[in-house]
Amino acid sequence: LDNLDDLPRRCRRCVFWELDPVSRDRAAEAGDPALEKEAWISSTLLEWGSCGKIVYVDGAPAGYALFAPPLYVPRSVAFPTSPVSADAVLLMTAHVLPEFAGGGLGRMLVQGVAKDLTRRGVKAMEAFGDLKGETGSCMVPADYLLSVGFKTVRPHHRFPRLRLELKSVLSWREDVEVALERLLGSMTPEGALRPV
């Protein structure tokens, strides 16, 4: 929530995913969709936890991703390839600013989201891809999703649903680290380790 102002203006004011179409139109008429976005993020943070990532290059925001369980995303039921699978979290949007494109930041964003979700016990991430990939859209281009490891699970001529099994994103090293954490954690007396 502290970094919300670092989102590009178009995303900061966009509530395409966060509100149903009627509520979205009302927010636009009231003139403050950014306030609705902030309320949605705050509510999701309190109830579910972190729902976004921003990547910075030399202190400047270079890209972002927003994600949440489909239950928190009213628009997720409006697609011809709905619903999102019960064991998955929805990658709502992801974008790398043009001046930072081509440097692997998109892959890094998806890997960061995947690592976060894996720690929470989530099995997969799904997204509705946009085969037209229109500039300025809050939809994720399908070719981007495919390039970072997603597979099509429900084809469609415009909005296929794609899925990334989270185990496939973790490297061998990360698997070993997780196994060691589990092993050492299980041998630690309860109460010896406390959150800071």
Where are these regions (language model features)?
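Conserved acetyl-CoA-binding loop-helix of GNAT-fold acetyltransferases
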Residues: 93-96, 102-118
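Conserved catalytic-core motifs of GNAT/GCN5-like acyltransferases
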Residues: 128, 142-163
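Active-site rim helix/loop that mediates acceptor-substrate recognition in acyltransferases
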Residues: 11-52, 56-57
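Glycine-rich phosphate-binding loop
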Residues: 104, 140-141
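Conserved beta-strand edge residues that scaffold enzyme active sites
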Residues: 59, 131-132, 159
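Conserved acyl-donor/pantetheine-binding loop and adjacent beta-alpha core of acyl/acetyltransferases
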Residues: 31, 43-50, 56-93, 139
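C-terminal "cap" of GNAT-fold acetyltransferases
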Residues: 138, 154-194
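Conserved GNAT acetyl-CoA-binding A-motif
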Residues: 110, 117-136
